[in-house]
A protein has these predicted regions:
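N-terminal export and membrane-targeting signals
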Residues: 1-2
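Solvent-exposed, well-ordered loop and adjacent helix/strand elements within mature globular domains
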Residues: 16-198
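C-terminal motif of bacterial Sec signal peptides marking the signal peptidase cleavage site
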Residues: 9-11
Length: 198
């Protein structure tokens, strides 16, 4: 179990660092079975409802490790956020590298609402490494679903606790892309709540 938990670490990066790829990509290591409970969301909250494969990255496994650097700041200068509409949590997404330029799978600034976390999130970081990140799971997705990586924090928690926290949220999750404000929120750092799911 410890090996499986450690394999769940995913990492994202700043523009000055090498971007690392989540350590797993096969269904045999997925945390959830695909059965995802659904929060009742009124139709008037805008956006597109879809399902994504969600992983987490932390202060401890970011690139560089022990930092909150991000590659595409929009609201935050460093990874963070409490999950409210006005202070969404930093998200990392896959990207394609071509001629030294990265094209993100979702544009920087795209907001998501992650139903089981009751958090708004915003794309501000890259997920995937090397010269061909498009060949990795962050870009190619999981079982036909987009892959997003949410920052859980963890600077004030130990590494093992934070890893277990990330494991708890890893799996298929219902999201709303470009949601309106006003959805239920559980504000605060994910790691501080033990990555509580609803």
């Amino acid at each position: 179990i410890v090996v499986a938990l450690l394999a769940l670490n995913s990492a994202c990066s700043s523009t000055n660092a090498t971007i690392r790829t989540p350590a797993f990509s096969g269904p045999e290591q997925a945390h959830t079975s695909g059965a995802v409970s659904r929060l009742a969301v009124p139709d008037n909250y805008g956006g597109q409802t879809t399902q994504v494969y969600l992983t987490g990255y932390s202060y401890w496994d970011n690139t560089p490790p022990g930092s909150a650097q991000i590659a595409r700041p929009v609201i935050h200068n460093r990874a963070g956020g409490t999950g409210t509409y006005d202070d969404p949590v930093t998200l990392a997404v896959g990207h394609v590298k071509n001629g030294g330029r990265s094209t993100m799978d979702f544009q920087a600034g795209t907001r998501f609402y992650i139903e089981r976390l009751r958090k708004y999130a915003i794309v501000e970081d890259l997920c995937g490494d090397g010269n061909n990140p498009q060949d990795g799971p962050c870009h190619s997705g999981y079982n036909g679903r987009p892959w997003i990586d949410i920052y859980v924090g963890g600077r004030h928690s130990d590494k093992t606790f934070t890893t277990n926290c990330m494991y708890r949220i890893t799996g298929l999750q219902n999201v709303i892309i470009n949601p309106n404000p006003g959805l239920p929120v559980s504000a605060g750092e994910l790691a501080a709540s033990g990555c509580q799911v609803f």
